[in-house]
Design a protein with these regions (language model features):
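Flexible loop/hinge segments that line or gate small-molecule binding clefts
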Residues: 122-161, 181, 276-283, 287-288
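Hydrophobic alpha-helical
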Residues: 109-131, 201, 215, 219-281
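Extracytoplasmic "Venus flytrap"
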Residues: 49-68, 72, 76, 80-99, ...
């Protein structure tokens, strides 16, 4: 046994005190942040976040999602995060995962997948996290929402009917109705609405053999790409009588190309989505028709359903299949009603009844 000299005792005590003091300070540096994290975590847990994942804010139609979501977030007094994929599927999924991690899965989602194929990895991610969500527009036809407990619903508009309507209106503008040449612009080829709208166009063409589709390009829903593609196609086909496009952003790009070729107003254009510029183009005699899809309502309905499920006010598992994959009606727009539609939906915002999630239900998606 070692015996410390008496004179050494105070020095050893001081040493032990210094060690203990350092340990105590080290403990405090660990405990204080932990307490702060716990406190903020409990505070955060009391406030669910809302989140929307959309393609971009450079599209006037997509901006309506944001406007609607912001109005709903203000109404329910919850924070909102707006995520954009910028046409990058991996970015979309990564951002969704980051949002789940940031909120501790305390989030209700509305999602417009970048591509139909993206719906599955998104569903698996959010289902594993126990996070409720609603998707819009794109998913693979063979993927069923009810196979994922937290995937509340997939909602869309009738894309085939949209393609039929806009193509029919375009053909009416020909010098000889049902006789003429057209070019066309598709969106993203992997998107469900693009495929459906294209199918509608093909139906009309099959019923009107006197109309020839000379060329088409995929402009990826983008205005600039549509402008460039239209310019190129006009070089090869300067004698067309119409331009069919799968959305309004591409329609506006096509109109710009037609203006530069001195064909605007002579060659009509159709689109889909119902952005303000397209309404003005219809009024100005540059476009024949569009379809108004109410992006503000889309976002609010999706968030309201997700939040209700999270709060236990919507029992997802008890919903029939027809309420988990369904369509709601859009508004056909031409020169006859463009002023009224613009007044009702653009210059003003309707009061949406979100107490009945299926008030606008039109038909089930198989």
């Amino acid at each position: 046994m070692r015996i410390f000299p008496l004179l050494a005792v105070p020095a050893r005590a001081a040493f032990l005190f210094r060690v203990s003091e350092r340990a105590r300070l080290r403990m405090l540096t660990l405990v204080i942040p932990l307490l702060a994290f716990t406190a903020t975590g409990n505070l955060h847990a009391a406030s669910t976040s809302l989140a929307i994942s959309i393609r971009t804010l450079s599209s006037p139609y997509q901006v309506m999602y944001k406007v609607g979501a912001e109005a709903y977030a203000k109404q329910v007094g919850l924070p909102l995060d707006v995520l954009t994929t910028e046409a990058n599927s991996q970015k979309g999924l990564t951002d969704i995962k980051a949002e789940v991690a940031r909120t501790g899965a305390n989030v209700a989602f509305y999602i417009d997948p970048n591509d139909a194929a993206d719906a599955v990895p998104i569903a698996k991610t959010l289902d594993a996290a126990g996070t409720y969500f609603v998707t819009w527009w794109s998913k693979p036809a063979d993927v069923k929402v009810w196979d994922y407990p937290h995937w509340i619903a997939h909602i869309s508009f009738d894309g085939v009917a949209a393609g039929v309507y806009t193509a029919t209106e375009l053909l009416k503008t020909f010098k000889t109705p049902g006789q003429g040449k057209i070019i066309a612009l598709q969106g993203r080829l992997g998107d469900t609405p693009n495929a459906e709208r294209w199918q509608g166009l093909q139906q009309v063409l099959s019923q009107n053999p006197g109309v020839k589709l000379l060329q088409w390009e995929s402009a990826l829903w983008d205005r600039t790409k549509a402008y460039n593609s239209t310019k190129e196609m006009l070089v090869a086909h300067p004698d067309i009588e119409g331009v069919w496009t799968a959305n309004d952003d591409m329609a506006m790009g096509a109109i710009q190309a037609l203006k530069e070729a001195n064909l605007a107003g002579k060659v009509m254009v159709t689109g889909c989505d119902g952005i303000p510029e397209m309404f003005d183009a219809i009024k100005g005699g540059l476009a024949a028709a569009t379809i108004f899809n109410d992006g503000k309502y889309q976002a609010q309905l999706g968030l309201a359903m997700s939040l209700a499920a999270k709060q236990g006010k919507l029992d997802v598992k008890s919903l029939p299949h027809e309420h988990r994959q369904f369509e709601i009606p859009a508004v056909n727009v031409n020169r006859e009603n463009v002023d009224q539609v613009k007044h009702d939906y653009i210059e003003n915002t309707p009061t949406y009844d979100l107490s009945d999630f299926f008030a606008k239900w039109s038909k089930a998606i198989p």
